From Swiss-Prot:
Protein's cellular compartments: Virion; Host nucleus
Annotated Basic and acidic residues bias: 8-22
Quaternary structure (record): Homomultimerizes to form the nucleocapsid. May bind host exportin-1/XPO1. Binds to viral genomic RNA. Protein-RNA contacts are mediated by a combination of electrostatic interactions between positively charged residues and the phosphate backbone and planar interactions between aromatic side chains and bases.
GO molecular function: RNA binding; structural molecule activity
Keywords, alphabetical: Capsid protein, Helical capsid protein, Host nucleus, Host-virus interaction, Ribonucleoprotein, RNA-binding, Viral nucleoprotein, Viral penetration into host nucleus, Virion, Virus entry into host cell
Protein species of origin: Influenza A virus (strain A/Swine/Italy/141/1981 H1N1)
Any Pfam family matching the protein: Flu_NP
Name of the protein in its database record: Nucleoprotein
GO cellular component, one term: ribonucleoprotein complex
PTM info: Late in virus-infected cells, may be cleaved from a 56-kDa protein to a 53-kDa protein by a cellular caspase. This cleavage might be a marker for the onset of apoptosis in infected cells or have a specific function in virus host interaction.
């Protein structure tokens, strides 16, 4: 972990802990994972799901969403104060899929939120276990990142759709805390700030009064989070300027867009964690695995080992390719939506194809789809090697990158060159000086122009055999740099809609 001075590791953020040593961190993360697993087993019992049905990823997602909804206090309060027809604010539910006479059927279930909170607390030693909830949110966020593109959202805030590699965590709820902030990409936070500034421009009272004071605190906090992700002094200084602005307006929006673009080359530090579906943890707990005793890490070999021997199923639509569905879920499990496909492919030991070539839609199934026509297949979530997840953007250099996505955000700490199309990125900076022209801008552009191909993005780290649990023998893969490395290249993914 880089600079462990004042920074808490993201395991600590994840578990809300104070500073702990490695063993304590592994134990508290293990406790969190075990709690999710115990909760899942109990829910499967309550819903009378068979073993096979409990391993269905669609059922896992429904159960996960129910517990998130049960603990969403803000929304629960809102629903109680603004009752809408046909919606019981005290209940939550979703589709559960059962196998009846060789066919899949959908059953819509409704549950008391209170009851679900009880089951969750019981599984977590009577505590609210917010860390476990955040963990589930990050898994959903990683799944969204791999499934959808955010072109519309990018365009609405004045950013360029080719900046999609900066949008990790863009669907995470506000309440996801420090662990959520750690996994958000530079573009995601820039976009949240731009939305705030736009509201302030349109609504004169946005920054005024008691509410305005709270808004201002939130604005400055978010600026600091974004500042902390940048690795160069000039980018950080520019964030100070945005934060200290008396009355944030268009100049700040331009500065934020400029900074987000600069992150395509001067990459920010964004954490990556392997968050798996609840059913995977449930299976492990059911087979007698004691997560708290064994300890667990979201950024090491543990999630890879867990996926090596977990069998998870998924419903597959008639014209979908099961191998492609597996790739989608594998990428989501390892938070690898914006990783270089060549690196992902090497680790997975299977070719990983760009989003546009996948014959699969998202994992979740809409209520108007005919489930009876669907089959279920085993998801192939195993890997050939494992690698440590990174929380840095790596150093930067030139390679050919693609038209659709013009940069990557590395997930795995593996020595390689990072591809980006300097000409394309730099072209985005020409003739846009609505924001302040400053020494900082000039300095940032100079650094971007001088980024050299020789700078390896990760020195000395490689991938490891699955038998090498202590990461003693790194294998440094060699990549064919002429291949396409971007996942969203020439893309036709669906848009993310709430």
């Amino acid at each position: 972990m880089a600079s462990q001075g004042t920074k808490r590791s993201y395991e600590q953020m994840e578990t809300g802990g104070e500073r702990q040593d490695a063993t304590e961190i592994r134990a508290s993360v293990g406790r969190m994972i075990g709690g999710i697993g115990r909760f899942y087993i109990q829910m499967c019992t309550e819903l009378k799901l068979s073993d096979y049905e409990g391993r269905l990823i669609q059922n896992s997602i429904t159960i996960e969403r129910m517990v998130l909804s049960a603990f969403d206090e803000r929304r629960n309060k809102y629903l109680e104060e603004h009752p809408s027809a046909g919606k019981d604010p005290k209940k939550t539910g979703g589709p559960i899929y059962r196998r009846i006479d060789g066919k899949w059927t959908r059953e819509l279930i409704l549950y008391d939120k209170e009851e679900i909170r009880r089951v969750w607390r019981q599984a977590n030693n009577g505590e609210d276990a917010t860390a476990g909830l955040t963990h589930i949110m990050i898994w959903h966020s990683n799944l969204n990142d791999a499934t959808y593109q955010r072109t519309r959202a990018l365009v609405r805030t004045g950013m360029d759709p080719r900046m999609c590699s900066l949008m990790q965590g863009s669907t995470l709820p506000r309440r996801s805390g420090a662990a959520g902030a750690a996994v958000k990409g530079v573009g995601t936070i820039a976009m949240e700030l731009i939305r705030m500034i736009k509201r302030g421009i349109n609504d004169r009272n946005f920054w005024r009064g008691e509410n305005g004071r709270r808004t201002r605190i939130a604005y400055e906090r978010m600026c600091n989070i974004l500042k902390g992700k940048f690795q160069t002094a000039a980018q950080r200084a520019m964030m100070d300027q945005v934060r200290e602005s008396r009355n944030p307006g268009n100049a700040e929006i331009e500065d934020l867009i400029f900074l987000a673009r600069s992150a395509l080359i001067l990459r920010g530090s964004v954490a990556h964690k392997s968050c798996l579906p609840a059913c995977v943890y449930g299976l492990a707990v059911a087979s007698g695995h004691d997560f708290e005793r064994e300890g667990y890490s979201l950024v090491g070999i543990d999630p890879f080992k867990l996926l090596q021997n977990s069998q998870v199923f998924s419903l597959i639509r008639p014209n979908e390719n099961p191998a492609h569905k597996s790739q989608l879920v594998w990428m989501a499990c390892h938070s690898a939506a914006f990783e270089d496909l060549r690196v992902s492919g090497f680790i997975r030991g299977k070719k990983v194809v760009p989003r546009g070539k996948l014959s699969t839609r998202g994992v979740q199934i809409a209520s108007n789809e005919n489930v009876e026509a669907m089959d279920s297949n085993t998801l192939e979530l195993r890997s050939r090697y494992w690698a440590i997840r990174t929380r840095s953007g790596g150093n930067t250099n030139q390679q050919r990158a693609s038209a659709g996505q013009i940069s990557v955000q590395p997930t795995f700490s593996v020595q390689r060159n990072l591809p980006f199309e300097r000409a394309t990125v730099m072209a985005a900076f020409i003739g846009n000086n609505e924001g302040r022209t400053s020494d900082m801008r000039t300095e940032i552009i100079r650094m971007m122009e001088s980024a050299k191909p020789e700078d390896l993005s990760f020195q000395g780290r490689g991938v490891f055999e699955l038998s090498d649990e202590k990461a003693t023998n790194p294998i440094v893969p060699s990549f064919d740099m002429n291949n396409e490395g971007s996942y969203f290249f020439g893309d036709n993914a669906e848009e993310y809609d709430n």
